[in-house]
Amino acid sequence: MTFVKKTRYLLAPPYCKTIETFISPIPNSPTETSGGLRLAGGWRCFKNLRVIQKKKNSLIEVLMPTQELLRVAKNYSKDSLNKTEFQIENLVNKRFPFAKLDMSKPHIMGVINITPDSFYKNSQVKNLKRLTKIFYEMVNNGASIIDIGGESSRPGAEKISVVEEKQRVVRPIEQLKNCKINSLISLDSRNLSTMKVCHKVGVDIFNDITAFKEKNKINFITKTFSPIIIMHMQKEPINMQINPKYNFAPIDIYKFFSKKI
């Protein structure tokens, strides 16, 4: 594990060849609806950045105004400025709709676990009557997506059979799709066979804790044009908390998702 040294000065100009540079926005107060740049074309603005630079095993963090970072890059080289502007544009650009949802505003996902061993007991559902009741409560409270899972992925959870997972989720999803509401239904599953069956009964989104690492899953979602949610974990749920190894988790996970996307 690498520790981050907080300092007032960069190791080097941003995005030069010998140093890795990463930036993240520091949002203004929620009541500050103007001033600075708009994050992802949405409702929050930012003027300042958290800049992290990595050289071998050394990490430093600098908090600085966006315009100051651009000034440093411009004074160094055209390449540094272009790369800095590109990364800031990635923060600012409006996001495309996801599963027809407008991503310029926040969305709530409700989670229903049709499992006996869920991490959060209040999300467990054991019969269809209670399932429908909870479903409508979530929708009425503003949930844009309802995520249905039949296999627990809590730390230490053991894998169940695909047959058992299907028995838990297919009929409930069929019932919920008949409710005629606007909220989308997401399937939380790592099994292609379950995904295929649930696609036939109308699931809108697939959410995979293994990040669709198998090629046959990628082929399936490409063929069906299905929206997906990619998750991150090390190893399997049963052993994911046994000595996980990160150099610096924010950067490690950022690189994981960058590669996946």
What do the PLM-derived regions correspond to, one by one?
Residues 108, 114-119, 153-156, 201, ...:
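Conserved anion-binding
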Residues 112, 138, 142, 146, ...:
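Conserved, mostly hydrophobic/aromatic
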Residues 135-136, 169-174, 195, 215-218, ...:
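Generic structural signal for well-ordered alpha-helices
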Residues 1-99:
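N-terminal accessory interaction module
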Residues 80-92, 119-139, 167, 211, ...:
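Glycine-rich anion/phosphate-binding loops
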Residues 116-120, 144-172:
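Glycine-rich, proline-tolerant flexible connector loops at the mouths of alpha/beta enzymes
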Residues 103, 158-187, 193, 223-233:
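Alpha-helix-loop-beta-strand connector modules within alpha/beta enzyme cores
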Residues 112-113, 185-193, 209-212:
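Glycine-rich beta-to-alpha transition loops that act as phosphate-gripper elements at the mouths
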